[in-house]
Amino acid sequence: MNKLKEEAKNKLIVALDYNNMEDAVKLTEKLGDKISIYKVGLESFLSTDGKLVDYLHEKGKKVFLDLKFHDITNTVKMACANAIRKKVFMFNIHCSNGSKTMKEVSDLVKESGSESLLIGVTVLTNLGEEDLQEMFRSSMKLEEIVLNLANLAKKSGMNGVVCSPQESKKIKELAGKNFVTVCPGVRPKFTLNADNKSNDDQTRIMTPSDAIKQGVDFLVVGRPITKAEDPVKAAEVILEEISEAL
C-alpha cells in the first residue's frame, strides 16, 4: 500500500450504526484490511452491550466511541472514566456541557495516562440555522456557535471537535492545525441527488475530496458504505477520492 492510500485509510472512520452484533461483524469481515477505524455509536453500543467494542479491538481495529456524553459534571466524568478503561481510540462529550466539565474530563484523561483522543461535539450535523433559531431564539449564526464551542473546547484542553466539514477550516484557523476535526456529514458524489444534496437526514454535507481540502482530519461515513449494494466497492471509491485530495 502506497503512502497516500495508507494516509487515506487512517482518515476514514466507518460508522457501524447497526442494532445487532451480527450485521456489524459481517460488514467488518467484508471490509477486512481496507478499514482500520470504526465508529460505535449509541445504537450499536447498546444493542451489543458494548461487546462490539471488544470485538473490534480483538480484530486490531481502532474505535471511535461516539456516545456524546451530556449530563452533570460528575456523571460525565464517571462515564468518561469507563470509556478510558475501554482503551478506545477516541470518544466524545458535548461541548455544551460547559468549560468546567470539559476541563475536568480533559484533566481526567491526562491523569490516567490514556492515549484516547477527547473530542467535543459542537452542533449536530443534522441541524441547520432554522433549527437553532427554533430551539434557542439566539441571534448568533450557526457557524458562530460552532466556532465559539470549538474555542471553548480548545481552551479546556480537549483534543478536537466533531463538526461539519464546512466548519473545519475556520476551526483550524482559530484553534491551530493540530486541533483535530472529526466530521460526519460526508457524502461521496455517488450518493448525491441532482441538486448535490443528500437524500438522508444530514443537512451540512460535503464530499470526501472537498472535506480533505478543508483540512478535515477524520471523515465519518456510515450509510454510503453500510447501505451500499457493494460496501467494499463503496469504501474503495471513497478511499480513492480521499487519497486523490491529499
Where are these regions (language model features)?
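Conserved, mostly hydrophobic/aromatic
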Residues: 14, 38, 68, 91, ...
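C-terminal helical cap(s) of enzyme catalytic domains, especially alpha/beta-barrels
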Residues: 102-108, 212, 225-246
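Catalytic cores of alpha/beta
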Residues: 27, 74-83, 169-171, 191-217, ...
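Structural motif
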Residues: 33, 59, 86, 156, ...
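Conserved anion-binding
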Residues: 6-12, 75-160, 164-167, 174-178, ...
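Conserved beta-strand positions in the central sheet of alpha/beta enzyme cores
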Residues: 36-39, 64, 89-92, 119, ...
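N-terminal amphipathic alpha-helix/helix-capping segment at the start of soluble metabolic enzymes
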Residues: 1-25, 168-169, 173-176, 198, ...
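Conserved alpha/beta-domain cores
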Residues: 16-34, 39-57, 73-75, 151, ...
